[in-house]
Amino acid sequence: MGSIEIPNCSGSIVYKTISDFIDFPNHEQKLWWHSTAPMFAEMLRVAGYDLHSQYKILGIFLNHVIPFLGVYPTRINNRWLSILTRYGTPFELSLNCSQSLVRYTYEPINSATGTVKDPFNTHSIWDALDRLMPLQKGIDLEFFKHLKQDLTVDDQDSAYLLENNLVGGQIRTQNKLALDLKGGNFVLKTYIYPALKALATGKSIKTLMFDSVYRLCRQNPSLEAPLRALEEYVDSKGPNSTASPRLLSCDLIDPSKSRVKIYILELNVTLEAMEDLWTMGGRLNDASTLAGLEMLRELWDLIKLPPGMREYPEPFLQLGTIPDEQLPLMANYTLHHDQAMPEPQVYFTTFGLNDGRIADGLVTFFERRGWNHMAQTYKDSLRAY
């Protein structure tokens, strides 16, 4: 009788070769490497990165990112809980299927994170940036410095929050970094969560975010038109809306080329709500948007998100538990220079749903698009991961 070979990403030659030569500075970093690098290496291979790029990317990850992931998560250890995943882990890999582009996101953590020196992890991101900037030409921190100053807490804010016991179960992540991997190079991005700043100042997240970007527009007026259009859409939904701004991001490149993205969380998980996010309540009605709307409806039919009102759950899930929850919808709006309207992107939040059923729906969608290689390899890749 024949046997079925189940793919296993731990067999990656690149991962094994690098592993043979590592002298880990501590056990935590060793655990991080061996639990993340096999999947990372396999994703790079499947996405078509050449061998030289695979080694370079994994080398940067090993030497300049893993040192900022903190203690390796277990069920019993005391660790910083990151908003990046529902399990509080500070690292996540993702794949842009249509462009075969791998990305990873992480919340930088250091020895001061969560201590009296840095109770809300405000400062460790600077050390992480110091490690990354010499590795890639073109990194520019102008937008980041502006937004971080406006939207994350300083030491005075931190003291106020602690003295008045205002944080409680509030998620404490304030900023994280992402690397879009293009060949052996990367484009660096940041994500900023103003929830703690809102607590410290008494201002809404929406007010903080939009006011900060408007101030950014004083030196970059080409971003103002799409920002005003987005604000008008958000305000039109009224004070009792189920949709609200949650975070923003920007590219850490030349300000004249950097994009700002504003993210909206929608608690009402319905096709109608997602259509409203995609078209900005009918404000976007060009041919490209309408074509995307048809694809959105097709995906909704294939994935079958259970409808209903979904609050963002608290607290974090314990490692190893099977999720029995569904997350709200989310959309982001990219502000491009010299464009009148923002560009939407919507997220199908499938966390907590059956992976096999979701994979079947995606394979069907890939086949209909003519993405034959992705359709043929997607399930095997998931099994390998």
Swiss-Prot record:
Q: Name one GO molecular function term.
A: tryptophan dimethylallyltransferase activity
Annotated signal sequence is none
Pathway involvement of the protein, from the record? Alkaloid biosynthesis; ergot alkaloid biosynthesis
The answer to whether the entry has keyword Manganese is no
Pfam short name (any one):
Trp_DMAT
Recorded catalytic activity of this chain's protein: L-tryptophan + dimethylallyl diphosphate = 4-(3-methylbut-2-enyl)-L-tryptophan + diphosphate
UniProt keywords (A-Z) are: Alkaloid metabolism, Transferase
Which Enzyme Commission numbers does its entry carry?
2.5.1.34
Which domain of life does the UniProt lineage start with? Eukaryota
The main enzyme category here is: transferase
Which residues are listed for L-tryptophan binding in this entry? 83-84, 92, 193, 246
- Binding of substrate occurs at 103, 189, 191, 259, 261, 263, 345, 347
Database matches in InterPro entries: Aro_prenylTrfase, Aro_prenylTrfase_DMATS
Keyword Transferase part of the UniProt annotation: yes
List, in alphabetical order, the GO biological process terms annotated in this UniProt record: indole alkaloid biosynthetic process
**Functional summary from the UniProt entry:** Tryptophan dimethylallyltransferase; part of the gene cluster that mediates the biosynthesis of fungal ergot alkaloid. DmaW catalyzes the first step of ergot alkaloid biosynthesis by condensing dimethylallyl diphosphate (DMAP) and tryptophan to form 4-dimethylallyl-L-tryptophan. The second step is catalyzed by the methyltransferase easF that methylates 4-dimethylallyl-L-tryptophan in the presence of S-adenosyl-L-methionine, resulting in the formation of 4-dimethylallyl-L-abrine.
Q: Which family does the entry's similarity section mention? A: Belongs to the tryptophan dimethylallyltransferase family.
On subunit structure and binding partners, the annotation says: Homodimer.
- The name under which this protein is listed is Tryptophan dimethylallyltransferase
Q: Native species of this protein?
A: Arthroderma benhamiae (strain ATCC MYA-4681 / CBS 112371)
Provide the gene name from the record. dmaW
